[in-house]
Amino acid sequence: MVQLDDALQDAYKKVEREESLILGAKAMVASTKNPEVKRRLESNIAVSENNIKYLRERIDALKVESGSERESQSDKDSSKKYSDSAKSTNSDDHLLSYNRSAFDLFNSEKPLSPEKISTMLQHLQMRLSIEQQCVSGIEKIMSLYSKEQKDKTDVIIKLKEGKQKVNLLKRSLKRYNELHIPFDISTPSSEEKQQASGLNFRGLAKPISGTLKVTIHSLRNIEHTSFLQTHSFTMPSYAVLYVDDAQVAKSRISQTDTWDETFIFDVHRAKEFQIIIYEKKKDFDIPIALILIPTTIIAEELRRKRNIQEMSETSWKPSIAESASRSDEKGSKSDPINAPNSSSSISTNSPLAPTAYYKLLSKSWLSLEPVGQICISLSFSKRTTKRQFPETGLGRQGAIRQKKEDVVASQVGHQFVQRQFYQIMRCAVCAELFSYSPGLQCENCSFVCHKKCVTKVLASCIAQSNSEKSDFGGLRYRIPHRFEPFNSLGAQWCAHCGFFLPLRRKDCFKCVECGITCHGQCAHLIPDYCGMSNDLKHQLLTELEVSKRPKKPELPNQENKTTNEKVYRKPLSSQNTFDTLPTISQGLLAATQPVTSVLNTSPLPKTPEKDRSLNVTPSSSTPTPASVLAPPSSASLSSSKDANRSVPESPRREKKNRVTLDDFTFLAVLGKGNFGKVMLAEYKVNKKFYAIKVLKKEAILKNEELESLKTEKHVFEVANKEKHPFLLNLFASFQTSTRVYFVMEYILGGDLMVHIQRQQFSVKRARFYGAEVCLALKYFHENGIAYRDLKLDNILLCPDGHIRIADYGLCKENMLLGNTTSTFCGTPEFMAPEILLEQQYSKDVDWWAFGVLMYQMLLGQSPFKGEDEEEIFDAILSDEPLFPINMPADAVSLLRGLLTRDPNQRLGSGPKDANEVMAHPFFASIVWDDLYNKLYEPSYKPLINDPRDLNNFDEEFTSACPTLTPVNTVLTRQQQECFRGFSSFATE
C-alpha cells in the first residue's frame, strides 16, 4: 500500500507535469498559425488548469490527513464548525449530496473528484478488456477468410476499427491514471459516503426496457485526425448510436460537428448505451471519440430530475424547516393529543408534492473519451405495467418475500445456486471471463464458476466442517500463496468470488509468486496450490482417482466374461458426476422431509366435497377452548349437515376439542394479499363475528412457507399472552384437507389506509396512532420478534378509536439484540436500505418502516416514490425525503432520525430500542402508561351502524363473493403431517 508521503510526492510530480504541459502549449500557441491547432492547444491548457486545481485540492486533503500542515486559526474554526455540523447528524451529508448522482461521472461540467476518477478507471478498464477480447476474436476470424478477398476486407476494416477503439480507451485510461493518486483517505464511513452520494455504479448493467429518446446537438473540443495536418478545415464526421453493441441509429454527416437530430427507439432489457463519433475517410471510417453509459444511470438521472422538478414547483425542501415557529414545538410538548396547530394536517397550507410521471428533456454536456464533449438531450419512458397506486395520495401494495433459490449442484461442501450476473465475472476454476450470463455461486462462501466447471471445483467450502473437508484426492501439494497488498490499477478479478477488483481498495491482495489476485476477505478461501494451474490439478486428481479405484473381483467360472467387461468399461466421466448431483427437492429433503417424500407415497383418494375438516387433536399443551368458541350443539350440527359436512368423528374423541369449517358462515371478504385472504364470518354457536384468515396448504408447501406459518401462529400466541391492547388477538386456528384458518377478532373500523384515503390525518391524529404503534413494536422487540411488514394496510382501527396491528405473516423470531437475518421481504415502499442491499439486518428495519409510516400519516404520501418496484428501490437507496417548509421541527427531526440509511445511526437502533423513539421530543409529553391503558380519548372514532356494516373496508375487497375457490390438488399423508398440531384454541 502506498504510504502517505509517497502519495504526496506523487501528487506534486503530477502538478509539475501539468504545469510543464501548460508552458509548452502556450509556446506552441504563440508559434503556430493553424487555427485548428490553436483551438486544440487552448482546450488542452484549460484541461490542464482544471487538473491542477483538482490535484492541489487532493494535496491539501492529504496534508490534513497527515497533520503536516498547520492551518490558520480561521481555517481551523471554519473546519471545526463544518466537522461539528457533520457529526451532529449524518443526514447532513445526504442533504449536501442530494444533487449528486452517478450521471455526474459523465457530465463534463461537474468538477473532478476522487470518486469520479476511480469509478471511471474501473468502468473503462472493464470495457477495455471486452474490446481486447473482440480484437483477439476478429484476428482469429481473419485467418478463416484468407482465400475470400471480399470477406477478408470487411474483417480487416472491423479489425482496424476495433484496434482504434482499444487505443481510445487506453488514452482515456492514461488520462485518468495521471490524475489518480493511489492513496485512500481512510475514514470509517468513506465507502458509505460514496454510496450515499450516488457516485457509484450500483447495479451497473441492470437491464431496463422502454423507449429511449436521444437528441444529438453538437460536439466541442473534439480531436480530429486533421489536428496535425497543415490544412485548416476539419474532416466530416457522424455519430452512431448503439444499444448493447447493436447499432440502432446513425446521424447524417456533418462538417461542423453540429446535428440537432433526434432519434427514438425501443429498448428491451438494455444494459449499455453508446455513442461513437466516426470521422469520414476514403478507405474506412475511423472512430475518434466515444461515450459509454449504463442505461440504468440514464433512467435514474431522469427520475432524480423529476423529483428536483417537483421540489421547485412546491414549497417542499429536503431539509429541516428552520423557520418553523417555536410555538408549534412548545404546543406539541405541552399536550401531544390536544396540541394547538395539531388539529389540522400539515399540508393545509402547502400543496402535496406531485407524484405524476414527468417526462423531462434536458441538455447536458457529456465527456467523450479520450477528449472532447458532446451535447445531447435524453428522455426515457420506462415500460411498466399497471400503476400500483393512484396519481396522488397513497394506495395498497402487497408484501413480497424472496423465494429460496434452488440448489442446482453440490461439490466439496459448496451449495451452488444459479445467479444472473450483470457485469463481467471470472470463473474461479477455468479463469475465463463471462458477462451478462448466468453462472453458479455458492450461497455460503460466494465461490463463482461456470456450470460446466462445477465438477472441477477442488477448494472446500468454508461452511464445511474440518472432518468433511476434502483432502484433494490425496494430492500432496501444499504450497501456500504469498499474498501482499497492492493497488489494482488494471483489469483484475478476484480468484475466488470472481468479481472485478475495484480501484483504490485497501484490501486487494496479489500473490507475488503466481500472480493471482483476490479480495482481502477471500484470501483465506483460496487453496494452497501456488504455481499449479487448475487444469493440471484436475488432471492429476483424475489419474489418482483412476489408480485408486478398486478392481472388480473376478469369478472363477466367468473369467473370460469379466475380462471383456474390463476392456470395454469406460471411466466415470465428469458429465455423469454432474448428472448425479442432487436436485432442489433432494437438497431440501432434510428441511422438509415429510413434504418431499410425496414422491414415494400414493395420494389420498379424492373426496367429493370442496373442503373437509380434519380431525386434528390439539396437543397436550393446547389450552382448553374458550366459552366464546364452544363447540356447536347437536341441533346446530344437524341444521348445517347439508352445507359442508365434516368427516365423521370417532366416538372416543370429545367434540368440545374441535372447531370446524361447518361452524362458520362466511359473509364478506375483508382483505386480500399475496399470501391469502381474510373473510368476515359468523360463528353459528354464539352468533358473534370473527375475521378468518384463509391460506391454502398447497401454496404454503410450494412456496416453502411452512416455517413462516408456524412463526405466525407463535406470534399470535405471544400477542395473546398479555392481551396486548394494540395487537390483534387470535381465538382459534383449525384446518381442513386443503386449507388452514386463523380465527381472529373482528375489528369493525377497517384499516388506516381506507381512512387516510378519505381524509388527511392531522398531526394530533398521526401522533396518537404513531405512539400506539410504537408500543406495539416495543412489545414485539422485547419478545425477540421483528415485525417486517408495518404499513397502513396492517393497522386496524377499533370502534373505540384505538388501533390494532394485524398480519404477522412476515414476522421473524429470535431477533434479540445482536441477532440478524438476511431474508428479502416486506412491502416495497417500507423496505429498509439494508434489506434492498441484501445485507444482514436486525429488528432495526422496523424503525425505518415506522419512519415511512409516520411520513405517510403526517403528509399523506410516501417519502419514496416510483413508477414500479425498481424505481421505488432506487429512490430508497439514493433519494432524500422532502418536507414542507411549515412542518414542525420536531416532526422533521423524528422522520430524519428514523429514515437514516445507516442502521447503526438510526433512531431506535441502540440497546434502548423503542425507548429511544419514545423519548423523542415529538412524543415528549405522552404518558406512555396512560396510553397503554387506553386512558387517552381518541380524537376520531369510526362510524359503525351495524356489525355487518362494511363501509370502513375497501370496496375492492367487499365487492367480491365470500366463497372458497375449489382446490383440485390432493395432498399426501406426509404433506398433511406437516400441519400436525396447527389447530388450537385461545384462553379467556
Swiss-Prot record:
GO cellular component: cell cortex of cell tip; cell division site; cytosol; division septum; mitotic actomyosin contractile ring; mitotic actomyosin contractile ring, intermediate layer; nucleus
A GO biological-process term: regulation of cell shape
UniProt cross-references to InterPro entries, sorted A to Z: AGC-kinase_C (IPR000961), C1-like_sf (IPR046349), C2_dom (IPR000008), C2_domain_sf (IPR035892), HR1_rho-bd (IPR011072), HR1_rpt_sf (IPR036274), Kinase-like_dom_sf (IPR011009), PE/DAG-bd (IPR002219)
Zinc finger feature spans (Phorbol-ester/DAG-type): 413-461, 480-530
Residue ranges of every copy of the C2 domain listed in the record: 189-315
Main location: cytoplasm
Subcellular location as annotated: Cytoplasm
SMART domains (UniProt xref): C1, C2, Hr1, S_TK_X, S_TKc
Binding site for ATP: 670-678, 693
All residue ranges annotated as the REM-1 domain in the record: 1-68, 107-182
Amino acid composition bias (Basic and acidic residues), ranges on this chain: 545-554
Biased composition (Low complexity): 334-348, 614-640
Limits of the AGC-kinase C-terminal domain: 924-988
Enzyme Commission number: 2.7.11.13
Spans annotated as Disordered: 64-93, 313-348, 545-572, 598-655
Gene Ontology molecular functions: ATP binding; diacylglycerol-dependent, calcium-independent serine/threonine kinase activity; lipid binding; protein serine kinase activity; protein serine/threonine kinase activity; zinc ion binding
Pfam families: C1_1 (PF00130), C2 (PF00168), HR1 (PF02185), Pkinase (PF00069), Pkinase_C (PF00433)
Similarity remark: Belongs to the protein kinase superfamily. AGC Ser/Thr protein kinase family. PKC subfamily.
Function: Involved in the control of the cell shape. Target of the inhibitor staurosporine.
Record protein name field: Protein kinase C-like 1
Gene from which the chain derives: pck1
